[in-house]
Amino acid sequence: MKRIISLLFIACPVLASAAPDNDKAAVQAVIAKYYNRPLAAHKCQLAKPPKDSETASDNIMYCMKPVADHTVTRNGKATRYVLYTGFAYDMQQKVKQDAHASSGLAELFVLEKADGKWAIKQHGSDEIGAWGEPSENKAWKFVQVGAQNWGYVAESSYTGQGDTTTSQNFLFTDDSNRIRKSLIINGNDNGAYYGNCD
């Protein structure tokens, strides 16, 4: 029985794998060119908040670093899914913005190779987290979301006025070749609102 199970694992094709190192530097160079705003003090690239952002200050940008990189075959082509996350950074004060209501940022880049060069085909972002930070790097999971679509998901939570809401936050490609974001609430606890019944 153990041999049969082992053979099944060997025979099954790997649909998604960690990206090979030989292309990683080339992919990161393409993304660095997209950002084109390095912040040497934190060894990151600066990104503006999304257009639909609720960020109150014009001074806030995000200090982005690579978190995950996976290769899949999508619609018959080798495709890279690269996730960057970053903390909120106050450009005027030159410090991390760590207010409770400040979120971090997650950005998904989808790249395809043409004529031996990687190019960004889709890009999308979402504000996520609290205290100026996104979900921890280890929290992000690579998931398949449909026959030819993949993305990343992480759990995040926010507490305000004693009420904590927990959610699964997705960034993924859809059949229209766009990056979508989705939030599924999977927990709520308002016990602190009532003083934990003390």
Predicted segments with their positions:
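Hydrophobic h-region of N-terminal signal peptides that target proteins for export
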Residues: I10-A18
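Signature of short aromatic-glycine-proline-rich micro-motifs recurring in repeat-based ectodomains
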Residues: A56-V72, P134-F142, D198
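Short beta-strand elements that form the blades of beta-propeller/WD-repeat-like
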Residues: R80-G86, D90-Q92, K96, N149-S157
